[in-house]
Amino acid sequence: MSGPNPNKQPVELNRTSLYWGLLCIFVLAILFSSYFFN
């Protein structure tokens, strides 16, 4: 899991966390919309 470039790890982690945040917001938006529409 450890890469040869320690400088590249934080960028990858930041990008992954950003994608996870967007995904969570997207799922929450769908859940809230379906809850309100029901």
UniProtKB/Swiss-Prot annotation:
A Pfam family reported for this protein in Swiss-Prot or TrEMBL: PsbL
GO biological process terms held by the UniProt record: photosynthesis
Domain of life: Eukaryota
Entry's localization field: Plastid, Chloroplast thylakoid membrane
Transmembrane segments: 17-37
InterPro entries the UniProt entry points to: PSII_PsbL (IPR003372), PSII_PsbL_sf (IPR037266)
Keywords: Chloroplast, Membrane, Photosynthesis, Photosystem II, Plastid, Reaction center, Thylakoid, Transmembrane, Transmembrane helix
Cystine pairs: none
Cellular compartments per GO CC: chloroplast thylakoid membrane; photosystem II reaction center
Membrane topology, from the record: Single-pass membrane protein
UniProt main location, coarse: plastid
Function summary: One of the components of the core complex of photosystem II (PSII). PSII is a light-driven water:plastoquinone oxidoreductase that uses light energy to abstract electrons from H(2)O, generating O(2) and a proton gradient subsequently used for ATP formation. It consists of a core antenna complex that captures photons, and an electron transfer chain that converts photonic excitation into a charge separation. This subunit is found at the monomer-monomer interface and is required for correct PSII assembly and/or dimerization.
Subunit and interaction comment: PSII is composed of 1 copy each of membrane proteins PsbA, PsbB, PsbC, PsbD, PsbE, PsbF, PsbH, PsbI, PsbJ, PsbK, PsbL, PsbM, PsbT, PsbX, PsbY, PsbZ, Psb30/Ycf12, at least 3 peripheral proteins of the oxygen-evolving complex and a large number of cofactors. It forms dimeric complexes.
The family this protein is said to belong to: Belongs to the PsbL family.
Protein name (record): Photosystem II reaction center protein L
Originating species: Cyanidioschyzon merolae (strain NIES-3377 / 10D)
Source species taxonomy: Eukaryota, Rhodophyta, Bangiophyceae, Cyanidiales, Cyanidiaceae
UniProt gene name: psbL
